[in-house]
Regions:
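Charged, well-structured binding/catalytic surfaces in domain cores that contact anionic ligands
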Residues: 218-219
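Bacterial N-terminal signal peptides
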Residues: 23-37
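Short, positively charged
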Residues: 313
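Bacterial Sec signal peptide processing site at the extreme N-terminus
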Residues: 34-61
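Short coil/linker segments at helix-helix boundaries
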Residues: 52-83, 87-90, 101-213, 222-256, ...
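N-terminal secretory signal peptides that target proteins for export/translocation
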Residues: 1-21
Length: 332
């Protein structure tokens, strides 16, 4: 794993994909009042069906072109999911929706704001990071609950021998493995002074490795983009870390056909910064800014969020590089 200084600063270990919450939130909320007056068996059946609908809902948020609007709307959807989980705690689809939803919200709207606030108000930035950590922990908890339901004794076995425990995981578990590991590693990045959490890294690595083994193309480059940053500092792995990161970058770009900004941003803020290659850094981020957010509506929100990060990173060239080049930074 990379050193703790790098873990806590500019690089990111995963990117959001899907934003699969919210499309049914309002209509489901209206139905809940009716369910409350129904008989027990009817009520449980209806709640389970509502859970199915919410867990399988489409990508309304994903295609939105207004990140600030989504930022305000997502908490309502997340609390609705939690309300349904209180009634149907064994609904693995809802647990996955909660795990992915809280991780995405923490990443795209809380931790991102913390990074941007750090130079202006450190106290506010630290408060935001503390909040992001709590949200990531909630995401991780929901993911582990779902995996426990699918594989009895999973968490205990994971802590005893991660690789052995994960042999029981199958392709249907990949989304849970991804989101649980993503939230977990993000918690660790925000807890560099907590040795107990840092000691969890072997479990995170085992989960990501198993997910990659089962479905390397999951999320249309989600795992590859995660591994761009992660491989750069993985401890004990064979081969050149940079070569591994660049291989995942190429795979992510191929799978997304160049329509995702996240791989470009990830390589720039990990490998380019590490190598102090400001020319490559600017080139990658300007390519990220050039991604047409309307070409793939399902990735519109994610691309807008990553393009905002690209602009912020370009504004920090003088902080990130000892000898920046003389070209003009593109912050359009």
């Amino acid at each position: 794993m990379r050193n703790l200084r790098n873990l806590s600063d500019s690089d990111r270990d995963f990117h959001p994909y899907g934003w699969r919450i919210g499309s049914l939130a309002l209509s489901l909320a209206c139905v809940i009042a009716f369910i409350g007056s129904s008989g027990c068996s009817v009520r449980q059946y209806a709640l389970h069906k509502l859970g199915d609908a919410l867990a399988q809902s489409g990508t309304t948020f994903a295609s939105d072109d207004d990140p600030d609007l989504v930022k305000d709307a997502v908490p309502f959807s997340l609390k609705l999911i939690e309300s349904l989980l209180a009634e149907t705690p064994r609904h693995t689809g809802l647990l996955l929706a909660a795990s992915s939803g809280f991780a995405q919200y923490a990443y795209g709207f809380v931790q991102e704001e913390a990074d941007e606030m750090e130079q202006r108000d450190l106290a506010v930035a630290n408060a935001l990071r503390s909040r992001a950590k709590r949200l990531y922990l909630r995401s991780k908890s929901y993911g582990l609950q779902a995996l426990e339901l699918k594989h009895r004794g999973f968490e205990k076995a994971l802590r005893e021998n991660p690789k052995t425990a994960l042999r029981t995981a199958n392709a249907s578990d990949v989304p849970l493995l991804y989101w649980t590991a993503a939230a977990w590693v993000s918690t660790i990045r925000l807890s560099k002074d907590n040795p107990e959490l840092i000691a969890d890294l072997p479990m995170v690595e085992a989960m990501i490795d198993r997910a990659f083994e089962l479905n390397p193309d999951f999320g249309e480059s989600a795992l590859h983009t995660f591994l761009i940053a992660y491989e750069a500092a993985r401890q004990g792995a064979k081969g050149d870390p940079e070569a591994r990161s660049r291989k995942h970058f190429e795979e992510a770009m191929a799978l997304s056909k160049g329509f995702q900004a996240a791989p470009l941003v990830s390589l720039a803020e990990t490998i380019s910064v590490k190598n102090q290659n400001v020319v490559e850094f600017k080139s990658l981020l300007n390519r990220a800014l050039a991604v047409d957010v309307n070409a793939k509506p399902a990735w519109r929100l994610e691309n807008l969020i990553m393009q905002r990060r690209a602009r912020w990173l370009l504004s920090r060239v003088e902080e990130l590089f000892l000898v920046p080049d003389e070209t003009t930074t593109n912050t359009k």
